[in-house]
């Protein structure tokens, strides 16, 4: 029997999202204009809370849809104006270019990255050293590349290896369905479960590695670029100003990696079963024999482009997004990718998030127009200069662990810069606050998948159900890192940030905002 028009419309609205979620969004859309008529300030805060809710519920529906509907309504009822949204987007064009072109550029270097992680996995037999290597490699790559892309590559490696062993274990050849374990003997199931535990721990180490490396440079995370632009810092300035916090955090993060692996805490410590290693090694040996000279040239070209990328970023030869565009042009030209559709695939990962970031800027425009954060900022700025750093770090960390860190970082750096321009805080204090805001948004946010885009990407990937990586298990496995990164970051903000920054300024290493 044909369903009614109303039922058809309800089913189409937000697609497969739960009915309670659809109903909640409709209630938001109905009450927002009514409350705005009574009290714009409360309506503004309600909008922010609703938007954070859509981010927290990202597994129910991609936040672009519900968040976009809320943003459109906010503009329509006068919470902000289209011209202000346009101004916010224009002010953050570099970030949008980063997401559009840099992520797409790295897509064409995936073969090299796959090669690197495959070599690591099969060359290092010690699980503790392998975990440390994955964490370090992810950290280094994320300092120069987009964290989403790094995680996507590690996911590709893990899915590939899981599929290889699953095919052997099920004895079904090319017809094998990696989601179906019904054809696997009990002995192989035990080994497969161990392999899942091994892959879960590696994925979490790599994910945390992207956070450890991403916080260190202005291109590591999208919000870093927003903060660097507000403070007028170059690539080198940003790295040096973050180093009093990020270097100790990196060291402690790597020690945590070794500790949880050695002790087998929080679901870590599972080793690669020897039978799985033999299967994977045979497959890799066969792949290497089949690699042509043309394939080897592609790897060499991608490595050279990687060197160009690091040099161009370090010397700030152009805007980050334009450097990414140069990577796209060189990588496609020199590796033979000439088809428009093949090139278009590179943009599928980044454009949804780019659109979501534009919606963020709409909400930021509402926050500015309605002065929503003024009471909080006023409260923080009443404290002593030293206490301000701690409060900014903690407020950022708390919000970033439940919301998106790009959103949180953008709000707080805008408020801090406004306070500096109004003469409420000094230039020197603003630069210290910028460092506290950056580390506050990046480090505590590893607590949940909501805070780190790379974690959310992992949780929603095809790999997660294969290795039994649920939301709760991810939070549990991230817990030791959350505690260590947050506490060490806080101690560094308290005790090393100001004196080390002052010392580097005296040495003439740091530029200041003019």
Curated annotation (Swiss-Prot):
Keyword set includes Disulfide bond: no
InterPro entries assigned to the protein according to its UniProt record, in alphabetical order: Na+/H+_antiporter_NhaB
Gene Ontology CC terms, in alphabetical order: plasma membrane
Transmembrane residue ranges: 23-43, 52-72, 97-117, 120-140, 144-164, 202-222, 238-258, 303-323, 353-373, 391-411, 447-467, 475-495
Single Gene Ontology MF annotation: sodium:proton antiporter activity
The reaction(s) this protein catalyses: 2 Na(+)(in) + 3 H(+)(out) = 2 Na(+)(out) + 3 H(+)(in)
Keywords recorded for this protein, A-Z: Antiport, Cell inner membrane, Cell membrane, Ion transport, Membrane, Sodium, Sodium transport, Transmembrane, Transmembrane helix, Transport
Pfam families: NhaB (PF06450)
Main location: membrane
Membrane topology label: Multi-pass membrane protein
Cell compartment(s), UniProt: Cell inner membrane
Described function: Na(+)/H(+) antiporter that extrudes sodium in exchange for external protons.
Family designation: Belongs to the NhaB Na(+)/H(+) (TC 2.A.34) antiporter family.
Name this protein carries in UniProt: Na(+)/H(+) antiporter NhaB
Native organism: Escherichia fergusonii (strain ATCC 35469 / DSM 13698 / CCUG 18766 / IAM 14443 / JCM 21226 / LMG 7866 / NBRC 102419 / NCTC 12128 / CDC 0568-73)
Biological classification of the source: Bacteria, Pseudomonadati, Pseudomonadota, Gammaproteobacteria, Enterobacterales
């Amino acid at each position: 029997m044909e369903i009614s028009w109303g039922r058809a419309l309800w089913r189409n609205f937000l697609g497969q999202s739960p009915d309670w979620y659809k109903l909640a969004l409709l209630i938001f859309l109905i009450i927002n204009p009514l409350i705005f008529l009574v009290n714009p300030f409360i309506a503004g805060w309600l909008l922010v809370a609703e938007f954070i809710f859509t981010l927290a519920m990202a597994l129910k529906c991609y936040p672009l849809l519900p968040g976009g509907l809320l943003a459109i309504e906010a503009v329509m009822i006068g919470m902000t104006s289209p011209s202000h949204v346009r101004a916010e987007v224009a002010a953050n064009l570099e970030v949008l270019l980063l997401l559009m072109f840099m992520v797409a550029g790295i897509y064409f270097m995936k073969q090299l990255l796959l090669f690197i992680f495959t070599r690591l996995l099969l060359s290092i037999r010690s699980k503790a050293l392998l975990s440390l290597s994955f964490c370090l490699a992810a950290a280094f790559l994320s300092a120069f590349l987009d964290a989403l892309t790094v995680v996507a590559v590690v996911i590709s490696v893990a899915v590939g290896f899981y599929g290889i062993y699953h095919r052997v274990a099920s004895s079904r050849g090319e017809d094998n369905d990696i989601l179906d374990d019904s054809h696997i003997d009990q002995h192989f199931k035990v080994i497969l479960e161990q392999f899942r535990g091994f892959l879960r721990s590696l994925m979490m180490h790599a994910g945390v590695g992207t956070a450890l490396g991403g916080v260190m440079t202005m291109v590591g995370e999208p919000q870093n670029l927003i903060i660097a632009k507000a403070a007028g810092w170059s690539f080198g300035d940003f790295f040096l100003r973050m180093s009093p916090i990020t270097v100790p955090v990196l060291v402690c993060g790597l020690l945590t990696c070794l500790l949880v692996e050695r002790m087998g805490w929080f679901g870590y410590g599972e080793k690669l079963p020897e039978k799985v290693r033999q299967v994977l090694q045979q497959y890799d040996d066969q792949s290497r024999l089949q690699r042509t000279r043309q394939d080897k040239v592609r790897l060499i070209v991608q490595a050279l482009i990687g060197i160009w990328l690091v040099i161009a970023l370090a010397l700030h030869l152009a805007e980050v997004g334009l450097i990414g565009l140069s990577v796209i042009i060189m990588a496609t030209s020199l590796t033979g990718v000439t088809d428009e559709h093949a090139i278009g695939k590179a943009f599928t990962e980044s454009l949804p998030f780019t659109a979501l970031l534009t919606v963020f800027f709409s909400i930021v425009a509402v926050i500015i127009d309605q002065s929503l954060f003024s009471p909080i900022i006023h409260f923080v700025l009443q404290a002593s200069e030293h206490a301000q750093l701690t409060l900014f770090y903690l407020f950022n960390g708390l919000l970033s662990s439940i919301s998106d860190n790009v959103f949180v970082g953008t709000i707080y750096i805008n408020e801090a810069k406004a306070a500096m321009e109004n003469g409420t805080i000094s230039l020197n204090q603003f630069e210290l606050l910028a460092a506290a805001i950056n580390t506050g948004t990046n480090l505590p946010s590893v607590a949940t998948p909501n805070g780190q885009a790379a974690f959310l990407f992992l949780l929603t990937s095809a790999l997660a159900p294969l290795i039994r990586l649920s939301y709760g298990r991810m939070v549990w496995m991230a817990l030791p890192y959350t505690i260590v990164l947050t506490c060490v970051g806080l101690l560094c903000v308290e005790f090393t940030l100001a004196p080390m920054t002052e010392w580097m300024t005296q040495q003439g290493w740091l530029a200041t905002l003019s």
